Regions:
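Long, well-ordered core segments of solenoidal/helical folds
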Residues: 164-173, 207-227, 270-290, 344-361, ...
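Substrate-binding groove/exosite segments of carbohydrate-active enzymes
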Residues: 147-252, 375-387
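The feature captures the catalytic groove of carbohydrate-active enzymes
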Residues: 108-111, 115, 124, 225, ...
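An extended acidic
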Residues: 1-35, 141
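Carbohydrate-active enzyme catalytic cores, enriched for enzymes
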Residues: 362-393
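Structural helix-adjacent loops and short alpha-helical linkers that scaffold large soluble proteins
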Residues: 151-154, 203-215, 254-275, 289, ...
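Acidic/polar, glycine-enriched structural segments that form the non-catalytic walls/loops
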Residues: 35-38, 42-189, 259-260, 268-280, ...
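Short alpha-helical segments and helix-capping/turn motifs at coil-helix boundaries
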Residues: 100-102, 197-198, 369
């Protein structure tokens, strides 16, 4: 969404963990992500242009130090290109209060090598690393990450899974209080408040601290009511929706698979987070203590377009009390002094969950039509299997 890379139409692209390459019979251009928010670029026989996709008030200017700087106003970002060989040209057509067709082009009769720094305010100092050094650093970093990735499955699948977790990790910045694993760096540039739990499970063996950070990146923005935001990114915390409370289940899995992960400091931090989250669902998402909590919108369930929301909401579903029961089980482990309290709370929810049992399967109810127990072919009816022995025979 920031730049369009302009190269000849016959360019063939190839990708490794450390380098993206575009090649034609006439030459090639290589791209490497360096330290911080820096892109290294090197080319031979070709010109590469980074053309801003365009937003109101984009423009380019020359800094007091004589450097050419591009402002992507819609992204609230500045870009400063530099070269150590070849040349870089910044262009734009001034239109009273902005520039159209803003672009940066790298070229050179003998090839070129340079960088683009992305920054919000003050440009960083020029790097002393060459392209080859930056590439070697990226390769070493990924090799170290891959070496800590558990064995299993097909070799290529393991490598790709490790790469996605490594490449989608962004540093703490702006609204992000911790290093966070985005779901994608293309369109889904957020950390959603249930995806974070699965990311934590995925990286716990490689980096226990990063696994904890995935919980903290969301819980650091927990509303005083206990509500978690739908997602967070470096700019905002979004509360129009939330996501299902899978975190107790995920933490139980982490403790089972990696017992050393649960330090006393983490235990002391997790308990109030989970307690407030449970309180939100039991206080604000249901009518009274004799009722099940409900999802108001499909987006909150994680089953965004599921059939059980075809008639609207709020909807009583079997997965939500299941996750809350597992939250109680998790709190009983983390907060052993009050284990009886949490187990009793879980038992009360289990009794209420039975009201969604048809005799053959779990169904759903609309809060506006609570006497009608609906059943369809959604997999949501199988989520209570996570409760194991808590289910009545």
């Amino acid at each position: 969404r920031l730049c369009r890379i302009v190269l000849p139409d016959d360019a063939v692209w190839s990708l490794s963990a450390d380098c993206l390459t575009a090649a034609t019979p006439r030459g090639r251009v290589e791209f490497v992500i360096g330290e911080g928010e820096r892109l290294h670029v090197r080319g031979q026989g070709l010109t590469v242009t980074f053309a801003l996709e365009g937003s109101r008030y984009d423009y380019a200017y020359v800094t007091p130090q004589g450097a050419q700087c591009v402002v992507a106003a819609g992204e609230d970002l500045r870009l400063l290109p530099r070269v150590t060989s070849g040349k870089v040209t910044v262009t734009g057509e001034w239109r009273r209060d902005h520039a159209d067709n803003v672009a940066m082009s790298f070229s050179g009769a003998e090839g070129f090598e340079g960088t683009i720094d992305l920054f919000p305010a003050i440009p960083p100092e020029p790097t002393t690393d060459s392209f080859d050094q930056a590439r070697a650093g990226a390769a070493d970093d990924f090799a170290d990450w891959l070496s800590r990735t558990p064995e299993g499955g097909q070799t290529e699948a393991r490598s790709l899974a490790a790469y996605l977790l490594w490449a989608n990790t962004v540093p703490a910045s702006g609204n992000l209080t911790r290093p966070a694993i985005y779901m994608s760096k293309n369109a889904m540039i957020n950390i959603w408040s249930w995806d974070n739990a699965f990311s934590a499970l995925g990286v716990a063996a490689m980096d226990p601290d990063l696994a904890f950070d995935q919980f903290a990146a969301i819980y650091d923005h927990q509303h005083p009511s206990g509500l978690l935001p739908d997602f967070v990114n470096d700019r905002e915390s979004y509360f129009a929706f939330t996501k299902p409370p899978v975190h107790g289940w995920a933490i139980l899995r982490l403790i089972e698979d990696h017992p050393d992960w649960l330090t006393e400091a983490r235990r002391a931090t997790l308990v109030p987070w989970l307690e407030r989250q449970l309180s939100y669902w039991l206080t604000y998402a249901r009518k009274d203590a004799e009722s099940l909590p409900a999802y108001c919108h499909g987006n909150e369930s994680g089953w965004d377009n599921a059939t059980f929301f075809a008639e609207g909401g709020p909807v009583l579903t079997p997965d939500l009390p299941t996750f809350l029961i597992l939250t109680c089980d998790c709190l009983a482990v983390l907060d052993s002094a009050r284990a009886d309290h949490w187990q009793a709370e879980g038992s009360r929810l289990a009794t209420l969950l039975d009201t969604l049992w048809t005799g053959e399967a779990f169904g759903t109810r609309l809060t506006a039509d609570p006497t009608r127990l609906r059943q369809d072919e959604s997999l949501i009816g199988f989520i209570p299997l996570l409760l194991g022995s808590r289910l009545a025979p």
